Amino acid sequence: MRDFLGFGETLMDHADPRGGSTGSRDLYARHRAMRERLRAAQRQGRMAVLDIGSFKICCAIIEFDGDIASPRVLGVAQLRSRGVRAGVIVDMAEAEQAIRQDVAQTERAAGVRVYHALATLTGGFPRSQTAAAEVAVSEGGRVTEADVVHALRACKIPSSGPAETAEARTTLHAQPVSWTLDGEHGLRDPKGLSGRRLGVDLHILTVAESAMRNVATALLSADLEPVGVVSTAYASALSCLMGDEQDHGAACIDLGGGASAVSLFLRGRLVFADLVRLGGEHVTLDVSRGFGFDFDAAERLKILEGSAIALGSSMRGAIGVG
């Protein structure tokens, strides 16, 4: 499932979609709880995956045919987003209606009903932090799953700065970046190796708890049971970056309508994620104001003639706008 949601050997943690503080919560236990919610959705046979953006809301209904790692897409639909700005919900009623309508349209396309949903979160002031821990390997000298769990549980989430209390933020993802065994660094999977001291470096992505709660509330209001929330930056990178790109190091920038999600990968792991509160809509506004076009005309011009790469052919001649 790692290529789809980031589960599997990464032991990635998702926060409780209904919220909750990070201070004393056990990351590994929360990961297990997340897996249980996904298994419940799998037993139902299908669920909705929602990309809740500032400009549009995209929905896909996927079906599990025995293997959770290989879901099948039954239907896809997208609608103009409402109630979302810069990647966060700012009008609950509008966002709930947009989600409800998009899911209903996708259900008609798929010919099925869904009752569970996984959603993305772009905003919420994402913050990358690191944590590390070292524990003694259990008797016998070979690293077991229990030793891995022990090391992960020994990691403590760094406290927030003085301007924010720890209770104001919640963990969205927590993922081991590398393992150390008796001073040997850069291990991908220590299980089965012999040693005395096992260490782990953990990347933790936290977001504002209120942003998480609002996503969960919007899903519940739309009669959907939330099974998880995923960072847009992380999900975009998993869908775009090849395995060797993730291993050797790569950045992924998801230029959205109202905000852009940025993620960095190294050695196959997410090592940094952030949000830039600028997106394609701001480019459209610049074109509109600079040339005196209305917004729709500027958006059309941007889509048809704009490019993220400066090409020689684009520097010559006039562009028709009529």
What function would you assign to each model-found segment?
Residues V283-E299:
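Catalytic P-loop NTP-binding/switch module of NTPases
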Residues M1-F55, A60-A250, L270, D294-F295, ...:
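Nucleotide/phosphate-binding catalytic cleft detector across ATP-hydrolyzing
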Residues L202, H248-S288:
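Glycine-rich phosphate-binding loop of actin/hexokinase-like ATP-binding domains
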